[in-house]
């Protein structure tokens, strides 16, 4: 897709001829992640869709235990040290970012009171600064308030090379300062068309300054709270066995009204993709399993007459690469790269 075609597609969204969802799906097909697709529309002056959750809770709790299965189990619970989705998802039970993404690529606030935009003056005209306003009713699980000092600390923590944070790429080229206890400004060295990276999504989860400030830099791996998170999220830490089990209990002071629904959560790790699929679809031992890299015929067989269903969600992530092991130069029955041939090097 060239620039003219992209501009035409964006204009089609503006005029209503193409839906926002279809635009995002088209961009995914070209390898552009949903968040970046959403930012393209925002910078073109197309208002973000108003997102509402499908869940309309009337009270907090009452849903019993939620049991989920990640056959690649979490090995630590500090989001700045996450080495994959397994660690990010394990951490997300307890920690939260300022904002995240919905399934249509819309930015949605979490710890932020509102989203930065040019309309409200929190995105500078030159694209070199962003201002975040925090919610004022958020507490860490130990009762201390979340403030802008925590946000600034996460930048200092992650951008320090001696911390060896896996999130350093999101924080090393910015400057962050507190305007007041609930306002933070992020400055970029140059105009940033995609500013929603630091403090957003899986790489943007906020850890508490008062528990980690003594463990910056070279001492970062020694922090006891790397394995015992104290966050702002819907569940409070109960226990953790690396690679095996993460347990949380409902946070009675959670800042979102009537959430969460489930009273406890168990995130089990281990096994393989097939056994994970079977544990949900066939035996019903778990309520949900993620990353089912299983042949379609096996999933269909497990789903048919079983106790669950398979949800397939398109995305831009790369899980693995398969090499074509056939010979592209040898023709068999009028076909090149026939399965009847072998690649001269890769086979």
Functional labels for PLM-detected ranges:
Residues 67, 147-154, 181-187, 233-234, ...:
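Alpha-helical secondary-structure segments
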Residues 69-124, 156, 230-232:
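N-terminal lobe/hinge region of extracytoplasmic solute-binding protein
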Residues 71-91, 111, 166, 195-205, ...:
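A structural "hinge/loop" feature
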